Amino acid sequence: MISVRTLVISEYGAYVYVKKNMLVIKKGDKKVEISPSEVDEILITVSCSISTSALSLALTHGISVMFLNSRETPWGILLPSIVTETVKTKKAQYEAIVVRKDNRYGEEIISSKIYNQSVHLKYWARVTGTKNDYKELLDKDEPAAARVYWQNISQLLPKDIGFDGRDVDGTDQFNMALNYSYAILYNTIFKYLVIAGLDPYLGFIHKDRPGNESLVYDFSEMFKPYIDFLLVRALRSGFRLKVKGGLIEENSRGDLAKLIRKGMEENVKEESDHNPKTLIQAIRAHAVKLASSIREGKEYRGFKLVM
């Protein structure tokens, strides 16, 4: 139920409420009490419930609350009111994207994404002792790099997974796990972009449509290869999802959410930054860096993995 600073509520019938300023998770006759000071984020999946007093206590303590449904998409996210330099940052963001049509930030994000995909493949080439095409990615544009990347990923996965390429509508375990895991990543990124004062709906790469979190999708591209790594590592180690009717079963969704959140709380190494940090801390730091770069009209250096 608990993954370090993330509280995952996924068991059918679980209920979260407040007692004496403590978060209480009840499931049948079992109860667990947790101090809000020990939690940064609550993930709650379908078939669970949470009281308004628990939501109030969470937000008062700066805890975000993320809701995920059964179809690998988020219902929504509740954020505490902690936002920095909003007006100045959003104005600069609008001017950069709409007025000047500044492509520097989007280009750096895509460059970092391809670099991280290459680093991910290189890691597995080293660990498995087999050759792959990690060098080829660096000379290709995004669509071509993606084709090479996913083709190589398919060779790394156990045959019973049945993955033969990235497809958001795919019904194999890996594609479904990617959808669900990316949804968790999107909500985490949404949170930190908003806190940094950026407009999550105004992006550099993805098209702006009503309700489309364009900047969230843009920004996530740099971090997706690490999410891919977490899933490949888990599936190669025997982790499996239970799927029924084209959906991940409830208990498996909870297991997957815990796996991803735990992985995001592992330390990652970043090029040109020797300070150890978790992936979540890296996301938060880069949201602040991007906001600062946009406000000041300066270059932004994207997130680049070392593995």
UniProtKB/Swiss-Prot annotation:
The keyword Membrane does not apply. Mn(2+) binds at residues 142, 206, 221. Keywords: Antiviral defense, DNA-binding, Endonuclease, Hydrolase, Magnesium, Manganese, Metal-binding, Nuclease, RNA-binding. Transmembrane segments: none annotated. Pfam families: Cas_Cas1. CDD domains: Cas1_I-II-III. It comes from the Archaea. Its EC number is 3.1.-.-. The keyword tRNA processing does not apply. GO terms for molecular function: DNA binding; endonuclease activity; metal ion binding; RNA binding. Signal peptide: none annotated. GO terms for biological process: CRISPR-cas system; defense response to virus; maintenance of CRISPR repeat elements. It is an enzyme of class 3 (hydrolase). Changing residue 142 to A: No longer catalyzes a transesterification reaction on branched DNA. Its cofactor is Mg(2+); Mn(2+). CRISPR (clustered regularly interspaced short palindromic repeat), is an adaptive immune system that provides protection against mobile genetic elements (viruses, transposable elements and conjugative plasmids). CRISPR clusters contain spacers, sequences complementary to antecedent mobile elements, and target invading nucleic acids. CRISPR clusters are transcribed and processed into CRISPR RNA (crRNA). Acts as a dsDNA endonuclease. Involved in the integration of spacer DNA into the CRISPR cassette. Homodimer, forms a heterotetramer with a Cas2 homodimer. Forms oligomers, probably binds nucleic acids as a homodimer. Belongs to the CRISPR-associated endonuclease Cas1 family. NCBIfam families: cas1. This is CRISPR-associated endonuclease Cas1 2. The gene is cas1-2.
